[in-house]
Amino acid sequence: MAVEAHHLNPLFSSNREMIHPVEASGVVYNTQMRYGTVPTFNPTVECQTSLFNPIYNISPVDRLVHQSMKPTIQSVDSSLTFNSDNNVDFLRPVSSRKRSREESVVLNPSAYMQIQKNPTDPLMFLGQDLSSNVQQHHFDIDRLISNHVERMRMEIEEKRKTQGRRIVEAVEQGLMKTLRAKDDEINHIGKLNLFLEEKVKSLCVENQIWRDVAQSNEATVNALRSNLQQVLAAVERNRWEEPPTVADDAQSCCGSNDEGDSEEERWKLAGEAQDTKKMCRVGMSMCRSCGKGEASVLLLPCRHMCLCSVCGSSLNTCPICKSPKTASLHVNLSS
């Protein structure tokens, strides 16, 4: 809030000493003199001061000198007197040449400034007391200064609060960014963990499936091995049992012609039967596809051993039962 101060002429404040009234005293300074007033003649004071005062008011230094000398003059005793028409004044010369303590006030700047700062006389100008106006002017200036100081203090406090809020907001924004980044990283790691857990579960299931397949294949291999051993044992057994059967057949065949066949014919028939058996055995051991290679491939699941190694890798069906081939085993019959 702005306050208007009463503006005075700078002459009033700069020439304050000029407009002080003359103090009332018994000497020449006691005259109620104003600007350019001639003092009354007093023979008692004539020996101490000049006849006339300056055209303006008494200077502060002269007034201080008068105030300092006044008690000194009154305190000195003397027997000399001077008679005038109306009164008798005692002339009391200074008994001591030492400077009194009061006189040192004039030469002490600090005391002079203290007196100037604390004037007790009213401020007069053209017969009007301006002390209240000057005091009001000083109060207005002090109020303006205090208002300005308070406003500056409030502005500084507001700026400090604003700066503090900005700093707090900047720190909060940085922390929020860091927290968001950490949250995103945590979410990403959580998703990755879920994916890895699902992957581990699927791998465990797949491992169990392959384990079951391996166990089933192992059981199939064991069954095929046992079947193959049985087939090989049967073939080996048939190989050792075939010649007596052929001899018996030849003997029975020869025994049916006892009347007109000779011994030579019996042996001839036995040889032909043997050749026929050999041809049948050779036909059974040859490849049913090409007819050239030896049958050494066992087809599954029909279990027919009717293909050679070359045809077994190229054909997908059994030439005997025409069933599709799912697997094949190579059998080594060499002894």
Curated annotation (Swiss-Prot):
Which residues does the annotated region (WRD domain) include? 196-232
Q: In which pathway does it act?
A: Protein degradation; proteasomal ubiquitin-dependent pathway
Its induction note reads:
Down-regulated by pathogen, salicylic acid and 1-aminocyclopropane-1-carboxylic acid (ACC). Up-regulated by salt, gibberellic acid and methyl jasmonate.
Q: Which GO terms describe its biological process?
A: defense response; proteasome-mediated ubiquitin-dependent protein catabolic process; regulation of programmed cell death
Q: What is its EC number?
A: 2.3.2.27
Q: Which PANTHER family match?
A: BOI-RELATED E3 UBIQUITIN-PROTEIN LIGASE 3-RELATED, SBP (S-RIBONUCLEASE BINDING PROTEIN) FAMILY PROTEIN
Domain characteristics, as noted in the entry: The RING-type zinc finger domain mediates binding to an E2 ubiquitin-conjugating enzyme.
What name is this protein filed under? Answer: Probable BOI-related E3 ubiquitin-protein ligase 3
